[in-house]
Amino acid sequence: RGCLDRVYEAVNKTCKNIKKNDVVVCIQGDEPMLHPSMISTVIKKLFSEKKAGATILGMQIVNEQQFKNKNILKIVNDSRGEVLYCSRSPIPYLKKFTKKSYAKRIYGIFAFRYYFLKKYFKTAPSILEIIESCDQNRICENNRGMYIAPFRFVESYSVDTYKDLKLVNNKIKKDTWSKKY
């Protein structure tokens, strides 16, 4: 099982008085270069979108290398911002990549209403979730309710390989926010 399941289990072990509309925020550990305003962005979107049970931070992809990287989850949403699909493949299909392309990526910060998280914990993993190794697709395949929380592009790197770790360690040394922690 994936991130949704681990978050639900952790909340139930640590938060004994949680109520159905309480908000749970998940920050994935492979995203060490997050900016504090990213957290408030997913929470604000959750409160502003009446139909949202979850929000996920999304950023424009600005280079073709990220677009083709299977470790970076790409995201497609409808005109209202509701997430339609997440993939490790380059989506949407682009004849030619440009910095102004529609391509977006997931940045590993999510906000959930507790009842929504509980609902998806009780739902079996979906076919597309298993194929893509992306549990957000369980939400997409089961009545949805997850919205993208758009965030302006900031230089960010996920840590999926040793090469990524070396790159991020060098970037963090120069990062103004990391120095404050």
Regions from the language model: what does each represent?
Residues 1-5, 62, 154-157:
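A short acidic, often aromatic-flanked loop/helix-cap motif at beta-alpha or helix-coil junctions
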Residues 34-126:
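Conserved core of the sugar-phosphate nucleotidyltransferase
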Residues 24-27, 55-57, 120, 147-151:
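Short beta-strands and strand-loop turn motifs
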Residues 19-21, 49-52, 144:
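Short, high-confidence coil segments that cap the C-terminus of an alpha-helix
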Residues 5-9, 68, 158-165:
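Short secondary-structure transition/capping segments
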Residues 1-44:
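Short phosphate-binding loop-to-helix
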Residues 101-181:
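Conserved alpha/beta core of the MobA/IspD/sugar-nucleotide pyrophosphorylase nucleotidyltransferase superfamily
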